[in-house]
Amino acid sequence: MNNYSWIQKKLHKFALSSQIIRETSFDIEKSLVSTKNINEDHVFVAGLARSGTTIMLNGLYKSNLFASLSYSDMPFVLAPNIWSNFSSSYKNTKLIERAHGDGIKISTSSPEAFEEVFWMTFNDKDKESAKNFKDFIALINNKYNKKRYLSKNNQNIRRLDLISKILPHSKILIPYRNPFQHSNSLLTQHKRFINLAKKDNFITDYMKWIGHSEFGPNYIPIIDENLKHQNEMNINHWLEQWYKTYLNSYKKYINSENIYFVSYEKLCQSEEYWENILNLLNIKIKYSFSFKDSEKEFSARFDSELAKKATDLESKLNSLTI
């Protein structure tokens, strides 16, 4: 986003900042492209940001079984087929490190989390949203000539019940990491993107337009009720977000038939664990994927009571099997 030209920035503003433009592009796309959806065996990856959702997206996308929104679909993500007729000249297969500075490299063909643009356009409490969401998935599958859709959207942790209701035959993966490593990563990224945004106002606008509020200048807590640690520059705020978010999900979905918790540490340590996930998702082609151990040394003063609760919850999550 920090390498966009003037015209690219203006095009993103035109396509993403206006509710009317987003709705109109979607309506035109539906009028020209088939929305027939013959399959609902889709996969949704949704957890707190920095839980390994992107690397898991990349790992599953490698199977070549799924369609997923990519950087090439920006900024007209609600009209991927129409936009593809105009965007071919913008394609760049050269890999560059993404703005997070975490070693993950991307190109215009890389899958990414742009689905939230749909939910920002169509209220998830609207009765028409279910049909529109199915149509949206069908349009993406149509463009990439696939039958299954792969989504990575951290904001979906707020609406897993809705997605399960709309697509009951799909599977949902909730990645999680060690709470202390995860909290440190969130705080680090929060500070990083706030500093980046001070140097380039477009970053704030871009993150707002794609619904990226997990950290940075547009930060909105996933859970904001009854917080003991409200200072987002304190690591305990992020540990509390980890604990409350995953505790809520654990209580609600522990016995769910289509929602599964996935340990990022186990992905890094066990090839068998990865193979179990492939089997779970009905991916017949077996292949390896390198999940990078992201553990970092750092010092911080954690709330002892909160730290114990988080550790106990992590143990419960780790006891679950795929």
Spans of model-derived segments:
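Pre-Walker A (Motif I) flank of P-loop NTPase domains
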Residues: 39-42
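A conserved segment at the C-terminal end of the G1
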Residues: 54-67
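PAPS-dependent sulfotransferases, especially Golgi type II membrane carbohydrate sulfotransferases
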Residues: 1-37, 187, 194-322
